[in-house]
């Protein structure tokens, strides 16, 4: 068995990635989220595949086909709610994974980090297009509002929007192409994940101390396979409680009303995992400025390696930057709350303040606190 594991050209790759992989001996549970994201991706692809067998991407029948899945298909309700809530679990794991990367300075592994940002954009695009498919009120108006943002691009904007729509409004052509893209993107994401892992295994994992762990490595199996399995059990437990007891807790009631182009919902808002970016978009009165801020809210992650001023990699022994980091987390929670609120006083000013704080913390405060800590510890 050992011979096959180490010699067979295909099994050898799996062996070097998940069995004999040298891993730091001190990585905490914050390093579990990579495997949990892999599990989420598998769940989403499998449930999505079964949904696609019964779904019809036509404006006249899309809403009815989803109702048919829930009412008439064997365990269709379970597959549908697993897919919808699986997206939420995916994003919870994603945000924790990125948050871990920022806290422990994992962004210094540039290729892995940049690949992760591309993955984040790809997953967000997939989730957005998936939200359009049930063809409820929020699906239709969400698609209209978000795609319409592209019209802010100078000169080519309007043409670009009509090209994406396949007409002069969100209609049958838009739904069909969104279904096609929503189907293909997870497989592209799977390929990108493999590249992400390839880059990670070039350098090896980071660790909570932020020190070189080459002198103290342990095999991935059995230590981290067992540890990851515990994480998997906890995730599945939380996932099934959410899916079976509170299936609609994270959804929007407006999406149980079929899409009607003549009737606008009182508050157009995306799924909860986009609310922070949506709040940043809305906090800028100018359309183009809002779109740029929206893109930058994610793209700013790519600047993090260049904004790292500290001589230490992680925040483990850096109390000043630690405090600023947790203020950033609180700020993101405030933005998420504001994104779901109507555009009126006092939410407008809170959203604008939180948006300014978000960029200020990342671009100005964290680099400055890094330099202050270097001075305090005489690390210059």
From Swiss-Prot:
Transmembrane portions of the chain: 33-53, 77-98, 113-133, 178-198, 226-246, 288-308, 320-340, 347-367
Cofactor note: Binds 2 heme b groups non-covalently.
Any single GO CC term annotated in Swiss-Prot or TrEMBL for this entry: respiratory chain complex III
Superkingdom of origin: Eukaryota
GO BP terms: mitochondrial electron transport, ubiquinol to cytochrome c
Residues annotated as binding heme b b562: 83, 182
Membrane topology (UniProt): Multi-pass membrane protein
Quaternary structure note: The cytochrome bc1 complex contains 11 subunits: 3 respiratory subunits (MT-CYB, CYC1 and UQCRFS1), 2 core proteins (UQCRC1 and UQCRC2) and 6 low-molecular weight proteins (UQCRH/QCR6, UQCRB/QCR7, UQCRQ/QCR8, UQCR10/QCR9, UQCR11/QCR10 and a cleavage product of UQCRFS1). This cytochrome bc1 complex then forms a dimer.
Protein name per Swiss-Prot or TrEMBL: Cytochrome b
Species per Swiss-Prot/TrEMBL record: Microtus cabrerae (Cabrera's vole)
Gene: MT-CYB
């Amino acid at each position: 068995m050992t011979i096959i594991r180490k010699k067979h050209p295909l099994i050898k790759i799996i062996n070097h990635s998940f069995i004999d992989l040298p891993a730091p001996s001190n990585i905490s549970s914050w390093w579990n989220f990579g495997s949990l994201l892999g599990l989420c991706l598998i769940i989403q692809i499998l449930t999505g595949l079964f949904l696609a067998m019964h779904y019809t991407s036509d404006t006249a029948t899309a809403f009815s086909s989803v109702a048919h899945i829930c009412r008439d298909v064997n365990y269709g309700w379970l597959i549908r709610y697993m897919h919808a809530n699986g997206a939420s679990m995916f994003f919870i794991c994603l945000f924790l994974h990125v948050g871990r990367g920022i806290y422990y300075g994992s962004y210094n592994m540039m290729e892995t980090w940049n690949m992760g940002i591309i993955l984040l954009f790809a997953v967000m695009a997939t989730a957005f297009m998936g939200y359009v498919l049930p063809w409820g009120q929020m699906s239709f108006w969400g698609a209209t509002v978000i795609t319409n943002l592209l019209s802010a691009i100078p000169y080519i904007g309007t043409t670009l929007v009509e090209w994406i729509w396949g007409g002069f409004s969100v209609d049958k052509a838009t739904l069909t192409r969104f279904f096609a893209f929503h189907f293909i993107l997870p497989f592209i994401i799977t390929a990108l994940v493999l590249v992400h892992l390839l880059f990670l295994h070039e350098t090896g994992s980071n660790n909570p101390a932020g020190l070189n762990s080459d002198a103290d490595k342990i095999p991935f199996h059995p230590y981290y396979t067992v540890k990851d399995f515990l994480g998997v059990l906890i995730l599945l437990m939380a996932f099934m409680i959410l899916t079976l007891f509170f299936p609609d807790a994270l959804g929007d009631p407006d999406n149980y009303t079929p899409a009607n182009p003549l009737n606008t919902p009182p508050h157009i808002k995306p799924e909860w995992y986009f609310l922070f970016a949506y709040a940043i978009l809305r906090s800028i009165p100018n359309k183009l400025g809002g779109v740029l801020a929206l893109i930058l809210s994610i793209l700013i992650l790519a600047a993090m390696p260049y904004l790292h001023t500290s001589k230490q990699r992680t925040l483990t022994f850096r109390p000043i930057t630690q405090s600023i980091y947790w203020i950033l987390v609180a700020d993101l929670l405030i933005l998420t709350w504001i994104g779901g609120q109507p555009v009126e006083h006092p939410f407008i000013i809170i959203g604008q303040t939180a948006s300014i704080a978000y960029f200020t913390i990342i671009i100005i405060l964290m680099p400055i606190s890094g330099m202050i800590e270097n001075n305090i510890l005489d690390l210059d």
